[in-house]
Structure formats: structure tokens, C-alpha cells
Amino acid sequence: MKTKAGFVALIGKPNAGKSTLLNTLLNAHLALVSHKANATRKLMKCIVPFKDKEGYESQIIFLDTPGLHHQEKLLNQCMLSQALKAMGDAELCVFLASVHDDLKGYEEFLNLCQKPHILALSKIDTATHKQVLQKLQEYQKYSSQFLDLVPLSAKKSQNLNTLLECISKYLSPSAWLFEKDLMSDEKMRDIYKEIIRESLFDFLSDEIPYESDVMIDKFIEEERIDKVYAHIIVEKESQKKIVIGKNGVNIKRIGTNARLKMQEVGEKKVFLNLQVIAQKSWSKEEKSLQKLGYIHQRKRD
């Protein structure tokens, strides 16, 4: 069997549709999806198998990255550094741009990225044929910069095989790097954490999802059930009250929504216990971000 394998960094501005694209390619719910921008915070590896036209069985390891943005908050700096690291580690990049975005995001990407890349134009199902053609024409002035330009729709599964074919074309022949049926090397507890975060985006408005995070305190895997004990961190007591809701109605909705998604992904029953705490300025403190896994502790000599 002829095989290829390689790491591909998936880059884009917040809300370009990166996580939706990956979940569609995987036919599974692993990456956090929200209609709100900048939901993804940590890099995730998603493994997509694909047989190309030349007969190669390719293992494409996507590095799902936080959206490219510049903010002074320490958490946002950590997110940007993860995206930059992914670009450095990958042999190929895919820059995903919404058909409705201007070219500034891509121009910023060109200043940051030294790797060969494919430009993918997303959400074409939400634009007219004329609008799509116009945007493709606008990007043509950068044709010397990208390897290929692929218009696509993750929601409608349009041109996804075209994208995978383009990626496989530029990967080197190699033995597979992961087991055949593995979709991600993420631990289940980390996937569950992201599912809880997604539920926060689903049920809470305004700034609360952006000023909150989730810590898994205890995770017990049993044959027929996973037991998850977690707490939701917010910055203000007023936010804590909103997350809990009157008579606990909001936290129940968040918990039920998250638990059902966990059971779908884990393919077994899940017991979920959620608590809420207020911790002022957690997103600006290095110790808090270390505990949450956004900053790795420096090794002492």
C-alpha cells in the first residue's frame, strides 16, 4: 500500500469556519463549533484519512488552531503563540478565509507564514455565484503566493474532496504516523472539556463565554460510564449568578447539553457534575493559565 502522511496547520481569522470544516471531514464532533468568533483556544490534532487520485492512502494530520488576532490579554497572547507554533511545525498550511471577509486577514497571514500554503475560501453556500467569483478574482493578485485556491462549503460538503486532493498532492510519501482508525490524539477528558466550553457559547451571551473556562477536576473512565467532575471559571460574581441562573436553570441546560454531546462522542453514558466559581483576572494570570494548560511550566535547570 502506498502511503503519505503529514502535518497541516489550519489557519484563519476567528469564525472562518475551521472547526466546522474539521468536524465535517471527520464526520464527528471533536472541534468546538460556535457562531461566535474566537471560540477555539487550544491547538488540536485531527486525523483525516484520504485516498488520492494517485492511489496513495494519505493520513492528513490537521492542526486546528485558534483564530489569528492580536490582543494584549495574556490568554489571547497564548492563543496566538499556539497558532504560530502550528505554522512552524507543519509542512503545509491551509489558510481558511470566509467569502465575506476582506483580504486583510490573508495579507496578515502572508507576513507571518513562511511555509507553502493552500488558500481555501469558505462559506460559499452563503454567497451568490457572482460574489464567489468576485472574491476569487480578488485573491488572484496573490496567485504567486499560494499553491492552490479552493472555494468550499463545509456545511454543504462542497469541494471538500478537492481540498483533500490538493493537500495530499503536496505531502511526501511516508508511513502513517498514527493508528488507522484514530481521529485525534486528544485525551477524552480534554475533548469533554471543549464540549462543556461549547455549551457555554450555546447558552450564554455577550462576554461571558469569552471570560470563562472549564477545569476538569476529576475524570473517571469505566467500561459503561465516564464520570466527569468539572468547574466553570468566570471572572465576576455577577457572571457566576448568570451561569447558574434562577433556581439553577442555566447550569442545568448547559450540563444537559454538554452531557448529551459527550455521550455521542464517547459512545457511552456520562455522569457530569458542574460547579461554578468566580476568579478575578484568571485570564491575565500566568499561574491560572498554567493550570488550564495554556502555558507550560518552564523546566528548571
From Swiss-Prot:
Keyword match Cytoplasm: yes
Gene Ontology terms describing biological process: ribosomal small subunit assembly
Residues in KH type-2 domain copies: 204-280
Keyword rRNA-binding: yes
Highest taxon of the lineage: Bacteria
Keywords: Cell inner membrane, Cell membrane, Cytoplasm, GTP-binding, Membrane, Nucleotide-binding, Ribosome biogenesis, RNA-binding, rRNA-binding
One of the record's GO molecular function terms: ribosomal small subunit binding
Residues covered by the Era-type G domain: 4-173
Region spans: G5: 152-154
Annotated region (G3), positions in chain: 64-67
Chief location bin: cytoplasm
Spans annotated as G2: 38-42
Compartments where located: Cytoplasm; Cell inner membrane
Region (G1): 12-19
Protein residues bound to GTP: 12-19, 64-68, 122-125
GO cellular component: cytosol; plasma membrane
Membrane-related topology note: Peripheral membrane protein
CDD domains: Era (cd04163), KH-II_Era (cd22534)
Complex formation: Monomer.
Xref: PANTHER family: GTPASE ERA, GTPASE ERA, MITOCHONDRIAL
Assigned protein family: Belongs to the TRAFAC class TrmE-Era-EngA-EngB-Septin-like GTPase superfamily. Era GTPase family.
Biological function: An essential GTPase that binds both GDP and GTP, with rapid nucleotide exchange. Plays a role in 16S rRNA processing and 30S ribosomal subunit biogenesis and possibly also in cell cycle regulation and energy metabolism.
Record protein name field: GTPase Era
Organism per entry: Helicobacter pylori (strain G27)
Source organism phylogeny: Bacteria, Pseudomonadati, Campylobacterota, Epsilonproteobacteria, Campylobacterales
Gene from which the chain derives: era
